[in-house]
Amino acid sequence: MKLVLASNNRGKLAELQSMFSPLGVELVRQADLGVGEADEPFHTFVENALAKARFAAEHTGLPALADDAGLCVDAFGGQPGVQTAYYATRFGYEKGDANNVRALLEQMRGVASRRAAMVSTLVAVRSPDDPEPLIAVGRVVGEIATEPRGDGGFGFDPVMFIPEFGKTFAELPVEVKNAHSHRGRSAQQMLALMRERWF
């Protein structure tokens, strides 16, 4: 089954493709089908993911899978949340993973509580007007490290310290990270939902 991924993020594609391949699902980025990015005007992960999935399905004619994910820092009232990808731009930096990490570490300087959660909300639709979208949420709680560690992953992985492993996501082998990450958890839920309702 071909499923359009409502994202142009190559990191998300690689991570999700490895998780969905056992189901016989081939993920294709919407950009590879000539489709641009959907607007993300909402304040919650689920609303943005649903908007992206419907947009991709409408413009490709294929079932669609969308992920809206982000970092929610307790000391910042859950921010940056849905604005995670643009976090660095709030502090005068260009958009990008390295700048996001840099800005976060600068803002966390002197902050005692380093507790944070990575959240991934996956939404799948069979068509743009699917009345019963599949929704899966994965969440991992950890702490923001004081400096980047590790070379793997993307986004905030180098500073998302997971106490149960004693490492950041970027220090974990990819198969361990994928099994225990926020996206890994939401993907496992989504796979179960797809098996139950679509296959």
From Swiss-Prot:
EC number(s) on file: 3.6.1.66
A molecular function (GO) term: dITP diphosphatase activity
Positions contributing to Mg(2+) binding: D39, D68
Binding site for substrate: S7, N8, N9, R10, G11, K12, A69, F154, G155, F156, D157, K177, H182, R183
Keywords on record: Hydrolase, Magnesium, Metal-binding, Nucleotide metabolism, Nucleotide-binding
GO terms under biological process: nucleotide metabolic process; purine nucleoside triphosphate catabolic process
Record's signal peptide: none
Cofactors (names): Mg(2+)
InterPro entries cross-referenced by the UniProt entry: dITP/XTP_pyrophosphatase (IPR020922), ITPase-like_fam (IPR029001), RdgB/HAM1 (IPR002637)
List of catalytic residues: D68
Cofactor, how bound (note): Binds 1 Mg(2+) ion per subunit.
NCBIfam families associated with the record: RdgB/HAM1 family non-canonical purine NTP pyrophosphatase (TIGR00042)
Similarity comment: Belongs to the HAM1 NTPase family.
Quaternary structure and interacting proteins, as annotated: Homodimer.
Function summary: Pyrophosphatase that catalyzes the hydrolysis of nucleoside triphosphates to their monophosphate derivatives, with a high preference for the non-canonical purine nucleotides XTP (xanthosine triphosphate), dITP (deoxyinosine triphosphate) and ITP. Seems to function as a house-cleaning enzyme that removes non-canonical purine nucleotides from the nucleotide pool, thus preventing their incorporation into DNA/RNA and avoiding chromosomal lesions.
PANTHER family: INOSINE TRIPHOSPHATE PYROPHOSPHATASE (PTHR11067:SF9), INOSINE TRIPHOSPHATE PYROPHOSPHATASE/HAM1 PROTEIN (PTHR11067)
Protein name: dITP/XTP pyrophosphatase
Organism ancestry: Bacteria, Pseudomonadati, Pseudomonadota, Betaproteobacteria, Burkholderiales
